[in-house]
Swiss-Prot record:
Transmembrane segments: none annotated. It comes from Clostridium botulinum (strain Eklund 17B / Type B). The active site is at D127. SUPFAM superfamilies: Phosphofructokinase. This is ATP-dependent 6-phosphofructokinase.
Length: 320
């Protein structure tokens, strides 16, 4: 193996730059050439590749987003399109590809592997929705961004004695909502893993809190449930307490990565190169029990949700 390429795909996550830096510098240290691919699989199809060196990744570990840019590429599901991508990689002399992203990005990597390109995936998504790894790159930073926002919302919620319903990211995974809820002392946490929730029970919880002296309530809602605006109107109507909805949106994706995300991304990126040099392909890198691990992509994606029911139950007790 002489040359590898690296791309970021799907939604951006803080810490992606730290991972890029780790891959590039580890690869160069091992005597490999490195190429960056701009704008994910879409950029790959357009031949947007460029040579990278140590200087290319100087002063980026503290930056949010991704210097390689990112994009979604639904056409990559077409095998003929993927064959075109392989021809482009071959034309540049690329032997292996490191992909930073989520499950969709990993599927693209797996399919490229079947066409002869060695691939390794790094988990870059704020949702923490890849069950094979304890944490994904970007989760910790997004969590801290959310908690900071909740703290500010709580200030105004307290002043106005109102209910604040805060919607956070997490389409199929409630980890952000759960961890943010317990970190901020929320009165209720609503996540997709717990099934359909009872709006009337939520209203009773809020009224019970008021009867015990609570002057305001914070409710954290995962976007996979959605409907924050509608829920706030329902709560206000049934409880008689003013309620407001806040959808945090893309602020959760931005900002300088936390120290934890920088360390995680650096460890994962370095291991990705080591696994490639061992001749492995179609693998993903993750962390379990603070140990860096690698696993077959299919096996990793087949693992069911790792939602922490024990932590949810702790949050339920502490919110009363």
């Amino acid at each position: 193996m002489k040359k590898i390429a690296i791309l970021t795909s799907g939604g951006d996550a803080p810490g992606m730059n730290a991972a890029i830096r780790a891959v590039v510098r580890t690869a160069i240290d091992k005597g490999l050439e490195v190429m960056g691919v701009q704008r994910g699989y879409s950029g790959l199809l357009n031949g947007e590749l460029f040579a990278m060196n140590r200087t290319s990744v100087s002063d980026i570990i503290q930056r949010g987003g991704t210097i390689l840019r990112t994009a979604r590429c639904p056409e990559f599901k077409d095998e003929e399109v993927r064959k075109r991508a392989v021809k482009i990689l071959n034309a540049y002399g690329v032997d292996a590809l490191v992909v930073i992203g989520g499950d969709g990005s990993f599927m693209g990597a797996k399919l490229l592997s079947k066409l002869g390109i060695k691939t390794i995936g790094l988990p870059g998504t704020i949702d923490n929705d890849l069950a094979y790894t304890d944490f994904t790159i970007g989760f910790d930073t997004a969590l801290n961004t959310i908690v900071d926002a909740i703290n500010k919302i709580r200030d105004t919620s307290t002043s106005h004695e109102r209910v604040s319903i805060i919607e956070v990211m997490g389409r199929d995974c409630g980890d952000l909502a759960l961890h943010a809820g317990i970190s901020s002392g929320a009165e209720a946490i609503i996540v997709p893993e717990m099934g359909e929730f009872d709006r009337d029970a939520l209203c009773r919880t809020i009224l019970d809190g008021k009867n015990h002296g609570k002057t305001h309530s914070i409710v954290i809602l995962a976007e996979g449930i959605g409907g924050a605006e509608e829920l706030s109107k329902y709560v206000q109507e049934l409880t008689g307490i003013e309620a407001r909805a806040t959808i945090l949106g893309h602020i959760q994706r931005g900002g300088a990565p936390s120290a934890s995300d920088r360390v995680l991304a650096s460890r994962l990126g370095a291991r990705a190169v080591e696994v490639l040099l061992q001749g492995e392909t179609s693998r993903v890198i993750g962390i379990r029990d603070n140990q860096i691990v690698d696993q077959d992509i299919d096996e990793a994606l087949a693992i069911e949700s790792k939602f922490d029911l024990d932590l949810y139950n702790v949050a339920e007790v502490l919110s009363r």
